[in-house]
Amino acid sequence: MNVVIVDTECANLTSVRFAVERLGYSVLITDDAEQIRAADRVILPGVGTAAAAMRNLQRKQLVEPLRELTQPVLGICLGMQLLTSHSEEGDVDCLNLIPAKTKRLRDSGLPLPHMGWNTLQPTADNPLVDTSDSYCYFVHSFAVAVDEYTIASSEYGERFASMIRHNNYFGAQFHPERSGKTGEALLKRFLELTLC
């Protein structure tokens, strides 16, 4: 299987690569559009700001290639937010692959960023996580509101989408590569996923 991690220059690529390699898969980290198009699975990780990541994707001419993919794609953390239509972080238009918006988490007396372990409440139609109260590791100040594209939610002062999906595009607000057995199982299911 050909697994590609997109190099946005705004991500900790090494930890994601090691997590996939531990599952027995070879990984290519690239910003080459043809290699991304040819992949069986594409992972879009991200750390930093949506504005910087979108600038990098535009500079590398990866926006349209990412929009044209038909294979399973997994956006992680900022990568999930990039799949949405817009982010309040820098007031930037994103890839618009999942018609949702990324907004700043409300200040509910809890520290921001939301950093640490939290539970997931997956929906019945989530092909990547099937157990409630699965603990995952989060680091974020922006989130997607729960809507029809939500396949798992979490709570931190307010309920937010911890996983989203539209067609072949999946997003995880948390870091599966840092989320122990739950994250490992999610990555394994993503890599073995068959789309209908």
From Swiss-Prot:
GO biological process, one term: L-histidine biosynthetic process
Active-site positions on this chain: C77 (nucleophile), H175, E177
Record's GO cellular component terms: cytoplasm
Domain Glutamine amidotransferase type-1 residue range list: 2-196
GO molecular function: glutaminase activity; imidazoleglycerol-phosphate synthase activity; lyase activity
Classification via SUPFAM superfamilies: Class I glutamine amidotransferase-like
Function: IGPS catalyzes the conversion of PRFAR and glutamine to IGP, AICAR and glutamate. The HisH subunit catalyzes the hydrolysis of glutamine to glutamate and ammonia as part of the synthesis of IGP and AICAR. The resulting ammonia molecule is channeled to the active site of HisF.
Protein name in UniProt: Imidazole glycerol phosphate synthase subunit HisH
Organism in which the protein naturally occurs: Idiomarina loihiensis (strain ATCC BAA-735 / DSM 15497 / L2-TR)
Chain's gene name: hisH
